[in-house]
From Swiss-Prot:
Keywords: 4Fe-4S, Cell inner membrane, Cell membrane, Iron, Iron-sulfur, Membrane, Metal-binding, NAD, Quinone, Translocase, Transport, Ubiquinone
GO cellular component: plasma membrane; respiratory chain complex I
Protein name: NADH-quinone oxidoreductase subunit B
Organism classification: Bacteria, Pseudomonadati, Spirochaetota, Spirochaetia, Leptospirales
Cofactor names: [4Fe-4S] cluster
Protein's organism: Leptospira biflexa serovar Patoc (strain Patoc 1 / ATCC 23582 / Paris)
Amino acid sequence: MGLTETLSKPGEMFGDMFQVATLDNVVQWGQSFSLWPYPFATACCGIEYMSTACADYDIARFGAERPSFSPRQADMILVLGTITYKMAPVLRQIYDQLAEPKFVISVGACASSGGMFHTYGVLQGVDRILPVDVYVPGCPPRPEAILDALVKLQKKVQSQGLEARRQEVMRKIEEINERNKPLVVA
Protein backbone atom coordinates (compact mmCIF):
# COMPACT_ATOMS: atom_id res chain seq x y z
CA MET A 1 0.00 0.00 0.00
CA GLY A 2 1.56 3.23 -1.19
CA LEU A 3 1.45 6.72 0.24
CA THR A 4 -1.25 7.83 -2.24
CA GLU A 5 -3.66 5.08 -1.15
CA THR A 6 -2.94 5.79 2.51
CA LEU A 7 -3.55 9.54 2.24
CA SER A 8 -6.77 9.12 0.28
CA LYS A 9 -8.67 7.91 3.37
CA PRO A 10 -10.22 11.00 5.00
CA GLY A 11 -10.63 10.99 8.76
CA GLU A 12 -7.63 8.79 9.62
CA MET A 13 -5.03 9.92 12.14
CA PHE A 14 -1.36 9.50 11.30
CA GLY A 15 0.41 9.42 14.65
CA ASP A 16 0.15 12.63 16.63
CA MET A 17 1.14 14.74 13.65
CA PHE A 18 -1.84 15.29 11.36
CA GLN A 19 -5.20 14.05 10.18
CA VAL A 20 -6.27 13.76 6.57
CA ALA A 21 -9.66 15.25 5.71
CA THR A 22 -11.42 16.86 2.79
CA LEU A 23 -12.27 20.55 2.88
CA ASP A 24 -15.97 19.66 2.92
CA ASN A 25 -15.43 17.53 6.07
CA VAL A 26 -13.58 20.34 7.82
CA VAL A 27 -16.30 22.87 6.96
CA GLN A 28 -19.05 20.49 8.12
CA TRP A 29 -17.24 19.81 11.40
CA GLY A 30 -16.72 23.51 12.09
CA GLN A 31 -20.27 24.37 11.12
CA SER A 32 -21.77 21.67 13.33
CA PHE A 33 -20.10 23.12 16.44
CA SER A 34 -20.84 26.77 15.70
CA LEU A 35 -24.61 26.85 15.23
CA TRP A 36 -26.01 30.27 16.13
CA PRO A 37 -29.61 29.88 17.30
CA TYR A 38 -32.43 32.35 16.87
CA PRO A 39 -35.11 31.44 19.44
CA PHE A 40 -38.63 32.18 18.16
CA ALA A 41 -40.42 31.67 21.47
CA THR A 42 -44.18 32.09 21.75
CA ALA A 43 -45.20 29.78 24.61
CA CYS A 44 -43.98 27.59 27.47
CA CYS A 45 -41.31 25.92 25.31
CA GLY A 46 -39.49 29.25 25.41
CA ILE A 47 -39.15 28.89 29.19
CA GLU A 48 -37.62 25.44 28.72
CA TYR A 49 -35.19 26.90 26.18
CA MET A 50 -34.14 29.47 28.81
CA SER A 51 -33.43 26.57 31.17
CA THR A 52 -31.39 24.90 28.44
CA ALA A 53 -29.29 28.03 27.99
CA CYS A 54 -28.53 28.29 31.74
CA ALA A 55 -25.59 26.79 33.58
CA ASP A 56 -27.35 23.60 34.71
CA TYR A 57 -27.67 22.28 31.16
CA ASP A 58 -25.05 24.48 29.47
CA ILE A 59 -25.89 24.66 25.78
CA ALA A 60 -22.47 26.31 25.33
CA ARG A 61 -20.69 22.95 25.42
CA PHE A 62 -22.43 22.11 22.13
CA GLY A 63 -21.30 25.31 20.40
CA ALA A 64 -24.68 27.06 20.44
CA GLU A 65 -24.12 29.44 23.32
CA ARG A 66 -24.56 32.58 21.29
CA PRO A 67 -28.29 33.20 20.88
CA SER A 68 -28.85 35.79 18.21
CA PHE A 69 -31.78 38.13 18.31
CA SER A 70 -31.25 39.27 14.76
CA PRO A 71 -32.05 36.62 12.14
CA ARG A 72 -29.28 37.90 9.87
CA GLN A 73 -26.72 36.87 12.50
CA ALA A 74 -28.13 33.37 13.04
CA ASP A 75 -28.15 30.17 11.00
CA MET A 76 -30.55 28.07 13.09
CA ILE A 77 -34.08 28.91 14.20
CA LEU A 78 -35.72 27.18 17.13
CA VAL A 79 -39.49 27.41 16.82
CA LEU A 80 -40.66 27.25 20.44
CA GLY A 81 -44.41 27.21 20.91
CA THR A 82 -47.70 27.84 19.17
CA ILE A 83 -47.68 29.47 15.73
CA THR A 84 -50.86 31.15 14.54
CA TYR A 85 -51.76 31.80 10.93
CA LYS A 86 -51.22 35.50 11.57
CA MET A 87 -47.65 34.82 12.76
CA ALA A 88 -46.82 32.42 9.92
CA PRO A 89 -45.78 35.08 7.34
CA VAL A 90 -43.58 36.77 9.94
CA LEU A 91 -41.92 33.46 10.83
CA ARG A 92 -41.35 32.71 7.14
CA GLN A 93 -39.80 36.16 6.64
CA ILE A 94 -37.49 35.58 9.61
CA TYR A 95 -36.48 32.20 8.13
CA ASP A 96 -35.71 33.86 4.80
CA GLN A 97 -33.41 36.34 6.58
CA LEU A 98 -31.30 33.63 8.27
CA ALA A 99 -27.72 33.16 7.10
CA GLU A 100 -27.05 30.23 4.78
CA PRO A 101 -27.11 27.29 5.37
CA LYS A 102 -30.30 27.46 7.42
CA PHE A 103 -31.45 24.94 10.02
CA VAL A 104 -34.81 24.58 11.78
CA ILE A 105 -35.63 22.79 15.04
CA SER A 106 -39.32 22.48 15.92
CA VAL A 107 -39.57 22.35 19.72
CA GLY A 108 -42.65 20.99 21.47
CA ALA A 109 -46.03 19.63 20.48
CA CYS A 110 -47.46 23.05 19.58
CA ALA A 111 -44.72 23.89 17.07
CA SER A 112 -44.63 20.37 15.64
CA SER A 113 -48.36 19.67 15.27
CA GLY A 114 -50.41 22.50 16.74
CA GLY A 115 -50.54 20.73 20.10
CA MET A 116 -53.84 20.88 21.94
CA PHE A 117 -54.90 23.94 19.96
CA HIS A 118 -56.71 22.33 17.04
CA THR A 119 -58.51 25.52 15.99
CA TYR A 120 -58.89 27.58 12.85
CA GLY A 121 -56.34 30.16 14.02
CA VAL A 122 -53.44 27.83 14.88
CA LEU A 123 -51.01 26.44 12.32
CA GLN A 124 -51.02 22.65 12.62
CA GLY A 125 -47.27 22.17 12.42
CA VAL A 126 -44.51 24.56 11.48
CA ASP A 127 -43.45 22.16 8.71
CA ARG A 128 -46.26 23.65 6.63
CA ILE A 129 -44.21 26.82 6.17
CA LEU A 130 -40.59 25.88 7.02
CA PRO A 131 -38.37 22.89 6.15
CA VAL A 132 -37.87 21.34 9.61
CA ASP A 133 -34.66 19.42 10.29
CA VAL A 134 -35.33 18.05 13.79
CA TYR A 135 -38.54 17.68 15.82
CA VAL A 136 -38.53 17.73 19.63
CA PRO A 137 -41.55 15.99 21.23
CA GLY A 138 -43.06 17.05 24.53
CA CYS A 139 -45.37 19.59 26.11
CA PRO A 140 -43.12 21.28 27.05
CA PRO A 141 -40.03 19.20 26.29
CA ARG A 142 -37.33 18.86 28.91
CA PRO A 143 -34.05 20.73 28.38
CA GLU A 144 -32.34 17.37 27.82
CA ALA A 145 -34.63 16.76 24.82
CA ILE A 146 -33.69 20.14 23.34
CA LEU A 147 -29.99 19.31 23.78
CA ASP A 148 -30.58 15.91 22.17
CA ALA A 149 -32.14 17.65 19.17
CA LEU A 150 -29.10 19.91 18.93
CA VAL A 151 -26.79 16.87 18.93
CA LYS A 152 -28.92 15.22 16.22
CA LEU A 153 -28.71 18.38 14.12
CA GLN A 154 -24.92 18.47 14.59
CA LYS A 155 -24.66 14.88 13.36
CA LYS A 156 -26.86 15.73 10.38
CA VAL A 157 -24.67 18.72 9.51
CA GLN A 158 -21.50 16.62 9.77
CA SER A 159 -22.85 13.79 7.62
CA GLN A 160 -24.42 15.87 4.88
CA GLY A 161 -22.45 17.74 2.23
CA LEU A 162 -23.19 21.38 1.53
CA GLU A 163 -24.62 20.71 -1.94
CA ALA A 164 -26.78 17.84 -0.68
CA ARG A 165 -28.08 20.10 2.11
CA ARG A 166 -28.97 22.84 -0.39
CA GLN A 167 -30.83 20.36 -2.61
CA GLU A 168 -32.76 18.92 0.36
CA VAL A 169 -33.87 22.38 1.52
CA MET A 170 -34.93 23.39 -2.00
CA ARG A 171 -36.98 20.18 -2.32
CA LYS A 172 -38.70 20.83 1.04
CA ILE A 173 -39.46 24.45 0.10
CA GLU A 174 -40.97 23.34 -3.22
CA GLU A 175 -43.19 20.85 -1.33
CA ILE A 176 -44.29 23.57 1.08
CA ASN A 177 -45.06 25.97 -1.76
CA GLU A 178 -46.98 23.27 -3.63
CA ARG A 179 -49.01 22.45 -0.51
CA ASN A 180 -49.79 26.13 0.16
CA LYS A 181 -50.61 27.08 -3.42
CA PRO A 182 -53.63 29.40 -3.42
CA LEU A 183 -56.77 28.19 -5.10
CA VAL A 184 -57.31 30.11 -8.33
CA VAL A 185 -60.81 30.18 -9.77
CA ALA A 186 -60.84 31.01 -13.47
